[in-house]
Amino acid sequence: MQPSRPVRPSAKAVVIHQQRLLALQLQDQDGVFYILPGGGQHAGELLPDALTREVLEETGLHVTCGDVLFVIEGAHGEPFHRVDIVFAAHLQGASTGEMLHPDTNQTGVAWLDVASLNSLPLYPSRLRRAIMRYAAGTAGPAYLGNECIGDPPCTD
């Protein structure tokens, strides 16, 4: 059993427009990678409100929050136990055209081809196939388990 760490709920957005997935582009010493927009829930804040706030801050885009699609955890390797609740989200209106509060290491915003997600560095990697199934209208598991370092890449 791991030492006690605080649990941090996080709301993440799956925004698909013209078969492309909205993602944050980040860069570290290992190169460029992508994550879903969204972030931590503040005390007293509802998850849909956290999602719309975070997406606006990170991308400059206004979205509405839809249904919960997936839950994935990050219980290892961080100072807290992250629980990501991943929602469908839909673009609304015009964008501000700027990242208001980009994430650490964020270099931009990208629209990734959904059909190619299995070969792109989108993390957590367990989301790749799940998002592809969702975009195709195919059901799959909602609970994706714990994100693990070294999760095998999806390459099929």
Q: Residue spans of the language-model regions?
A:
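Unchanged
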Residues: 41-64, 74-126
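Small-residue-enriched segments and motifs
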Residues: 11, 63-66
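Residue-level preference for beta-strand/loop junctions
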Residues: 5-7, 32, 79-83
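Nudix hydrolase/Nudix homology domain
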Residues: 31-33, 103-156
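Conserved Nudix-box catalytic region and its N-terminal flanking loop in Nudix hydrolases
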Residues: 17-57
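Conserved N-terminal beta-strand and adjoining loop/helix that marks the start
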Residues: 1-22, 71
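A structural signal for short, well-ordered beta-strand segments
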Residues: 13, 68, 87-89
